[in-house]
UniProtKB/Swiss-Prot annotation:
Keywords: Endoplasmic reticulum, Glycoprotein, Glycosyltransferase, Membrane, Microsome, Phosphoprotein, Signal, Transferase, Transmembrane, Transmembrane helix. This is UDP-glucuronosyltransferase 1A6. Its EC number is 2.4.1.17. It is found in: Microsome; Endoplasmic reticulum membrane. Glycans are attached at N281, N291, N429. One of its GO terms (molecular function) is protein homodimerization activity. One of its GO terms (cellular component) is endoplasmic reticulum membrane. The chain crosses the membrane at residues 487-503. It is a single-pass membrane protein. It catalyses: glucuronate acceptor + UDP-alpha-D-glucuronate = acceptor beta-D-glucuronoside + UDP + H(+); (5Z,8Z,11Z,14Z)-eicosatetraenoate + UDP-alpha-D-glucuronate = O-[(5Z),(8Z),(11Z),(14Z)-eicosatetraenoyl]-beta-D-glucuronate + UDP; 15-hydroxy-(5Z,8Z,11Z,13E)-eicosatetraenoate + UDP-alpha-D-glucuronate = 15-O-(beta-D-glucuronosyl)-(5Z,8Z,11Z,14Z)-eicosatetraenoate + UDP + H(+); (E)-ferulate + UDP-alpha-D-glucuronate = (E)-4-O-(beta-D-glucuronosyl)-ferulate + UDP + H(+). It comes from the Eukaryota. UDP-glucuronosyltransferase (UGT) that catalyzes phase II biotransformation reactions in which lipophilic substrates are conjugated with glucuronic acid to facilitate their inactivation and excretion from the body. Essential for the elimination and detoxification of drugs, xenobiotics and endogenous compounds. Involved in the glucuronidation of arachidonic acid (AA) and AA-derived eicosanoids including 15-HETE and 20-HETE. Conjugates small planar phenolic molecules such as 4-nitrophenol, 1-naphthol, and 4-methylumbelliferone.
Amino acid sequence: MACLLPAARLPAGFLFLVLWGSVLGDKLLVVPQDGSHWLSMKEIVEHLSERGHDIVVLVPEVNLLLGESKYYRRKSFPVPYNLEELRTRYRSFGNNHFAASSPLMAPLREYRNNMIVIDMCFFSCQSLLKDSATLSFLRENQFDALFTDPAMPCGVILAEYLKLPSIYLFRGFPCSLEHIGQSPSPVSYVPRFYTKFSDHMTFPQRLANFIANILENYLYHCLYSKYEILASDLLKRDVSLPALHQNSLWLLRYDFVFEYPRPVMPNMIFIGGTNCKKKGNLSQEFEAYVNASGEHGIVVFSLGSMVSEIPEKKAMEIAEALGRIPQTLLWRYTGTRPSNLAKNTILVKWLPQNDLLGHPKARAFITHSGSHGIYEGICNGVPMVMMPLFGDQMDNAKRMETRGAGVTLNVLEMTADDLENALKTVINNKSYKENIMRLSSLHKDRPIEPLDLAVFWVEYVMRHKGAPHLRPAAHDLTWYQYHSLDVIGFLLAIVLTVVFIVYKSCAYGCRKCFGGKGRVKKSHKSKTH
């Protein structure tokens, strides 16, 4: 009995992993997406490395966040751009979201802006798949599995080329999940990307959702048709990307305290909140800021790594609003310092966001509604003022607003008064704090931490060389078989045939029964005349 007591004190996640066991020392190839997408993947990669796995991260030689690390080996490949060009493109991508446009032109502007980054990713992928030295290195290393972000499908193509079981880390997609994961997605209650609808839609919203679902197929083709050409050249056969997306496992950064409930497949594992690391001690600098805030506490403000500066007029409006509240504002901002910045607002180029949100003095979180920030807000129970800018951020903000955990502002149209009122609302109205604390409690009430769960399933795929028993047979069906159109057509043909036979039989019977009598009567009349 005494032997069991120390084990009982171990973290549940650690015990779970130890009990299941793992063949340590497997070789994992990681094909990440640069930028904020890398942050969640990095946490998983580091934990896998700590468990003894040999990890190689494939990176373009010019990148933003894919730096050296003691946890993995980097294998770089050449790309046709330099660091200044890369930074300029990302800076342009972030800053363009503050440009006003008409509602009719907004979708086109969003598409063109997204293509700034998507084209850069394509150039990177093209260089990789045409670099014979890198491909030779990958073939020779005999990896056990491939771990990738499928938003840009270079890793998907490599998994097919190297014949490796693959694991996808995924949060959102310009096209809905069913297009690549074969997961059912009823348009009646599963809102499509960019619609900003909830799961309770009015008839006009369901109509718009239905149309958006149709347009997603066209969008998918526009975004990824070039990758199909790359894949066909590399694999020496005609391929389609949906056919290549037959991975072993999806690690979805989902948690249904945040997402709307929807159907899923057995090879989909939910790991929302992996980026909510254990809160560490604040540095002396930030500890001093927090302590100086007094009873009013702090507000954390960050619009993410993609936004480096804000137009001067808008920045001054924001600064004016922040100066009207009693809290201390910690604003992550690398642009020009607003001339009207108040004494209660501190500009920093970087801040320990999760650690600050986890401090008892955190009163509110001003965020662009990126999924990483949303989950950190949920984990730490901090109500939010949301200023979504692009991508899935509008939908994320709608989800939190629907749950009563935050207020959404249109960053292009809001005034200083709007921001001031929103901050005072989420800070002073207790319902927002109560709602976010309830979400936090639900999120944390689980048998294993999402990071431990992600590590387990990556090891599971490496240990068993894939997970084909979890793969839905829907991947093997044509579109008309998936929707049973051939069965419906066959049954319809039978019904129509039966109806036709019955109709003809009745017509023939009527002619026999009534047609003969008519002729007899007619013949009788002619004889009497």
